[in-house]
From Swiss-Prot:
<keyword id="KW-1003">Cell membrane</keyword>
<keyword id="KW-0418">Kinase</keyword>
<dbReference type="Pfam" id="PF06293">
    <property type="entry name" value="Kdo"/>
</dbReference>
<comment type="similarity">
    <text>Belongs to the protein kinase superfamily. KdkA/RfaP family.</text>
</comment>
<keyword id="KW-0448">Lipopolysaccharide biosynthesis</keyword>
<keyword id="KW-0997">Cell inner membrane</keyword>
<comment type="pathway">
    <text>Bacterial outer membrane biogenesis; LPS core biosynthesis.</text>
</comment>
<keyword id="KW-0808">Transferase</keyword>
<feature type="active site">
    <location>
        <position position="175"/>
    </location>
</feature>
<keyword id="KW-0067">ATP-binding</keyword>
<dbReference type="GO" id="GO:0030490">
    <property type="term" value="P:maturation of SSU-rRNA"/>
</dbReference>
<keyword id="KW-0547">Nucleotide-binding</keyword>
<dbReference type="GO" id="GO:0005829">
    <property type="term" value="C:cytosol"/>
</dbReference>
<dbReference type="GO" id="GO:0004672">
    <property type="term" value="F:protein kinase activity"/>
</dbReference>
<dbReference type="GO" id="GO:0005886">
    <property type="term" value="C:plasma membrane"/>
</dbReference>
<comment type="function">
    <text>Catalyzes the ATP-dependent phosphorylation of the 3-deoxy-D-manno-octulosonic acid (Kdo) residue in Kdo-lipid IV(A) at the 4-OH position.</text>
</comment>
<dbReference type="InterPro" id="IPR011009">
    <property type="entry name" value="Kinase-like_dom_sf"/>
</dbReference>
Amino acid sequence: MVAFDANEALTPCREGRGIGAILFDRERLRQAEVGLFSPQHWGSKARPVGEGGRGSAWFIDAPFGASVLRHYLRGGLAAKISHDQYLWRGSDRTRSFAEFRLMRALREKKLPVPRPIAAYYMREGLRYRAAILMERIEGVRSLADRALVAGRGAPWEETGRLIARFHRAGLDHADLNAHNILFDGNGHGWLIDFDRGVIRIPATAWRERNLKRLLRSLIKLRGERSVEDVQKDYARLRRAYDMAWNRGT
């Protein structure tokens, strides 16, 4: 867990029978309230994010800047039991607070990630719901989109070097897929979606697990491209990753 600092503010909140809290960046928000985490609150200023995810994210045109709101939803078999509720294990272990603080820690390491603005949870009994609000990186396209459009011309080497940089800092990304890697027109890259991610001592096992997950997503999202073409492009990514890792950059 990242230590609390002077730029964080924490305020309690209530919603119906729920009791919760909001963790926010005091440099971006003077105060925070539950409405920040509702797309209905923003009205026409909220637009659904179309790519990736489970329909749980919105672009927000907020007075404090272009932002992204994301609700935490469960996937797989767990979603059949409850699509948006998680077992309560304490505020510091909520998905939203953990991701907020992880993103802040990555930014402190000078890594290219969105700035977290606010995170909240709402608890009822032994269950809670959560959401996070972060800055939007504008003028970018995902690796998934770039691969479909540009194929071999997509930023494969840049992606390999970008991932190596995060791995060198100890980031074990829980969902490293082609939707969560973004590039702008100048070739600058970012990673997004750090839910369930952790900072740990760099080790081969989890680094390889991240990379294999990315390859699976590239194959799944390949469109009309052949698996062989995707594997060739991934080989370029992997060579660049290995070179950057071995150089310590």
